[in-house]
Amino acid sequence: MSKKFVHTQEELEKLSLKELENLAASMREKIIQVVSKNGGHLSSNLGAVELSIAMHLVFDAKKDPFIFDVSHQSYTHKLLSGKEEIFDTLRQINGLSGYTKPSEGDYFVAGHSSTSISLAVGACKAIALKGEKRIPVALIGDGALSAGMAYEALNELGDSKFPCVILLNDNEMSISKPIGAISKYLSQAMATQFYQSFKKRIAKMLDILPDSATYMAKRFEESFKLITPGLLFEELGLEYIGPIDGHNLGEIISALKQAKAMQKPCVIHAQTIKGKGYVLAEGKHAKWHGVGAFDIDSGESVKKSDTKKSATEIFSKNLLDLASKYENIVGVTAAMPSGTGLDKLIEKYPNRFWDVAIAEQHAVTSMAAMAKEGFKPFIAIYSTFLQRAYDQVIHDCAIMNLNVVFAMDRAGIVGEDGETHQGVFDLSFLAPLPNFTLLAPRDEQMMQNIMEYAYLHQGPIAFRYPRGSFILDKEFNPCEIKLGKAQWLVKNSSEIAFLGYGQGVAKAWQVLRALQEMNNNANLIDLIFAKPLDEELLCELAKKSKIWFIFSENVKIGGIESLINNFLQKYDLHVKVVSFEYEDKFIEHGKTSEVEKNLEKDVNSLLTKVLKFYH
């Protein structure tokens, strides 16, 4: 095995500072090379190279829990953990994950943000109960500190006094810069033994000072908060080192060694540059955060241009049109303005549309209050991230029966981001909620109609749409959206019917066209609504058909199959139901087409299964 990147802690310790810097440069080159071919999270990984090397040098990755928040910035860690020979398979089907996974030797799975410090706290408790001497190390970006869970964990960690290191990667995504050289000097001074001892003595003196002197001392302490962010963490009971240069290996290693020696919870504040080492990406957060394949020299995408608009682009344009038409429309996204297309609305209507950072719970509840005040909120959110606000969806929207619209992007299989990001559960967790209405467009025109309907609808409503483009274009005429009404797209005398939902309609149509070429046929229904179902149409369909095939990009449990079976039981109807929804297991990463083929959900596999029912 090549030893270019794979180093044990002992081997790293033997390298000179210059050799470590050369290692960092080689790793950046490798990361750029692989991401340019496979796509991935580029800028965040380029900004965390030195931090990861220093972690592996000062701490023992085989013993100390290494916890990466979100873990999209863990590529260097992978290269240092024996993954060099398979690094070229990054994000590919059956290849290396773009996130941390225990099955690949990592401590914990990650993909959603702001979990690392809670994991570190739990690891600290377990280590203490076992009587062991390990130290958890959590690497978290400053953007992830915009989520409340991170502060909940910091609050307990500061009170616990467990040995733990929180490495804060500040790439200017949310934390403001400290002020000048004085701040840097004071922050670094805080880590010295003299400062720690001096601070404790001052605290004891304050206990015996008269009130007036104590008041002046407190005012003096408050003034320090204007100079450095360190006291925020200190007030939570955490030691603080920083800010340091997150690309200066000497500084990082020194800070980590100091933190390790403290044997207390400590935050190291490291300032980094996203995209470091690739000039085209440096400082350009949004464009180079997550990328597809690109040409290294020009930075241009090498993906063949798709003339079809993405579902996200269609959503964004439609919402712009609606917002210009209806002044009571407002909207929010949680740290995904460009990903959801809400950036265009934030730019045009800054007083009506907001990015609230990684704060899905707050996003939902704040919009619930706006709905209570007579506004019509559109919450633009990825299907997978709506899971993070489930209690708020129930407690603050459904129970109140408020007029809130949930626009769920990235529904279905999302491809290379894998199991933590697949949008295959939203139907299952929203369908049981009273007052909720659920629907999905099959194409661009139906998306427009559904969004207009969603604005007029009374009560909470959610519609889902895929990553990328709709498969269908103008194969079928659009229909007016009426509550709980489906559309019978292909009607004939066949005893077999295809029931499609959202992008599933396209799959059903592709299978049906292949059947028709074999002189077979089937009815095709676009359910449009998952809740409420079109019971009138389905009762009519049940009289003339014997087998219903379900095409929907959700898991089977709690999905369309479950809803259809409940309907059949309600009316004592006897129809065989065959669902092509996803099985009860998490879906791995890879190109969507390859993942579908692995799951036997591609058109050819579905056709083979359907043909078994034709005699």
UniProtKB/Swiss-Prot annotation:
One of its GO terms (biological process) is thiamine biosynthetic process. GO terms for cellular component: cytosol. GO terms for molecular function: 1-deoxy-D-xylulose-5-phosphate synthase activity; magnesium ion binding; thiamine pyrophosphate binding. The keyword Chloroplast does not apply. Binds 1 Mg(2+) ion per subunit. SUPFAM superfamilies: Thiamin diphosphate-binding fold (THDP-binding) (SSF52518), TK C-terminal domain-like (SSF52922). Catalyzes the acyloin condensation reaction between C atoms 2 and 3 of pyruvate and glyceraldehyde 3-phosphate to yield 1-deoxy-D-xylulose-5-phosphate (DXP). Its cofactor is Mg(2+); thiamine diphosphate. InterPro entries: Dxylulose-5-P_synthase, THDP-binding, Transketo_C/PFOR_II, Transketolase-like_Pyr-bd, Transketolase_BS, Transketolase_C, Transketolase_CS. This is 1-deoxy-D-xylulose-5-phosphate synthase. Gene3D superfamilies: 3.40.50.920, 3.40.50.970. Belongs to the transketolase family. DXPS subfamily. SMART domains: Transket_pyr. Its EC number is 2.2.1.7. Pathway: Metabolic intermediate biosynthesis; 1-deoxy-D-xylulose 5-phosphate biosynthesis; 1-deoxy-D-xylulose 5-phosphate from D-glyceraldehyde 3-phosphate and pyruvate: step 1/1. Homodimer. PROSITE patterns: TRANSKETOLASE_1 (PS00801), TRANSKETOLASE_2 (PS00802). Keywords: Isoprene biosynthesis, Magnesium, Metal-binding, Thiamine biosynthesis, Thiamine pyrophosphate, Transferase. Mg(2+) binds at residues 142, 171. It is an enzyme of class 2 (transferase). Thiamine diphosphate binds at residues 72, 111-113, 143-144, 171, 278, 360. It catalyses: D-glyceraldehyde 3-phosphate + pyruvate + H(+) = 1-deoxy-D-xylulose 5-phosphate + CO2.
